[in-house]
Amino acid sequence: MGKSLYQKLYDAHVVYEAENETPLLYIDRHLVHEVTSPQAFDGLRAHGRTVRQPGKTFATMDHNVSTQTKDINACGDMARIQMQELMKNCAEFGVQLYDLNHPYQGIVHVIGPEQGMILPGMTIVCGDSHTATHGAFGALAFGIGTSEIEHVLATQTLKQGRAKTMKVDMTGHASPGITAKDIVLAIISKIGSAGGTGHVVEFSGSAIRALSMEGRMTLCNMAIEMGAKAGLVAPDDTTYAYLQNRQFAPKGDDWHQAVMYWDTLKSDDDARFDKVVTLDAQDIAPQVTWGTNPGQVIAVNQVIPSPESFSDPVERNSAAKALAYMDLQPGIRLTDVTIDKVFIGSCTNSRIEDLRAAAAVARGRRVAAGVQAIVVPGSGPVKAQAEAEGLDRIFLDAGFEWRLPGCSMCLAMNNDSLNPGERCASTSNRNFEGRQGRGGRTHLVSPAMAAAAAVAGRFADIRELN
């Protein structure tokens, strides 16, 4: 019987396996940030250990940083301490750090791919659930906890059991204006926010192949939002074109040898999956979440469902609770719902293509009165590229705020957050209660839809913008 891509990646990294024991996997890349790593480095120090392979570990500051200044003191004492600890730890243990003054600094899941740290066939871990992003390259990438971070730092290995497998086959071709964000929200709508629990999900089909690498990263980034352990897209010519000549990508003959191997990284025709889900991309409209998990989502032209429409009592109760928190009523259209803030950024949607899509909507328009709209590029290179293309001027002329790189309003861990009762159109990945600030109400959308909401002052269908 053939193997799935996940099984090939997993089996290639088993360094020790014994009966009744969880296999030990080799880890190719370890990404680190300031929030989940301090205790791990303290553990190394307490036991007199070193980082086993510091050249395979990369660190950045992203979660706690201010997006308005490079001052390390800007986001309070806790943030300052965490960033200072990261600087101290990286210097002591010989780990490459992209700090606030480094031109490549940015969100960990943005800088890894753009520097070529992430390659097909690798195992990638980080103390962050959205490590699944890197599965877009045909790499096995997943988030880990702080004790596991210490283990990887010390040994470059990690115990990891085998997951179940799921294939999501996206047939057909998406309509103009439909993005990877809409596609993945539609998938989560179909299978639910727990539909992928215990599985590694491989995304396949013509609509997936048509996505750019940045679109595939958005897709895999939100695999975790369907409960999956990781997301995968098999590498192809699109992958290789993105990676070639990047800093940490192979060069010369090594590149050609690597591509020959990467071409083998696909599921065999006779591979069997524990679950298979099929959707037609032509059926997908722009998506907007209405509730407090990413599975509570509808097309922008649909009405908000009634809790009574859910047959499952758990889903029914969840919907009722979500509507109360979001201050919404069943039967209304989201295009009638006004907003207070717009956030364009996060590890889901802060890359150059995302900013281009948002700028195309913002060009020649103005942010609606009473709306605060911020644009936060995912890294220094993304910011520089956007400014070279004049995107910053488009946003500024339209009344958007143009910020420095960081995680920003994705999570209420820095100065960018919602006040109680504020409603936000956000390109991030989570809409849980309080995710963007206590009492804040988050609606997940694509960058173009976020920009449209900013100029309309309410949710708007980008297909109908004049």
Curated annotation (Swiss-Prot):
Keyword annotations for this protein, in alphabetical order, are: 4Fe-4S, Amino-acid biosynthesis, Branched-chain amino acid biosynthesis, Iron, Iron-sulfur, Leucine biosynthesis, Lyase, Metal-binding
User: Which family, according to UniProt?
Assistant: Belongs to the aconitase/IPM isomerase family. LeuC type 1 subfamily.
> How many cofactor units bind, and how?
Binds 1 [4Fe-4S] cluster per subunit.
Function of the protein: Catalyzes the isomerization between 2-isopropylmalate and 3-isopropylmalate, via the formation of 2-isopropylmaleate.
Q: Which reaction does it catalyse?
A: (2R,3S)-3-isopropylmalate = (2S)-2-isopropylmalate
Put simply, this protein is called 3-isopropylmalate dehydratase large subunit
Q: Which cofactor does it need?
A: [4Fe-4S] cluster
Single Gene Ontology BP term?
L-leucine biosynthetic process
According to UniProt, this protein's pathway is:
Amino-acid biosynthesis; L-leucine biosynthesis; L-leucine from 3-methyl-2-oxobutanoate: step 2/4
Cited CDD domains: IPMI
Q: Subunit info?
A: Heterodimer of LeuC and LeuD.
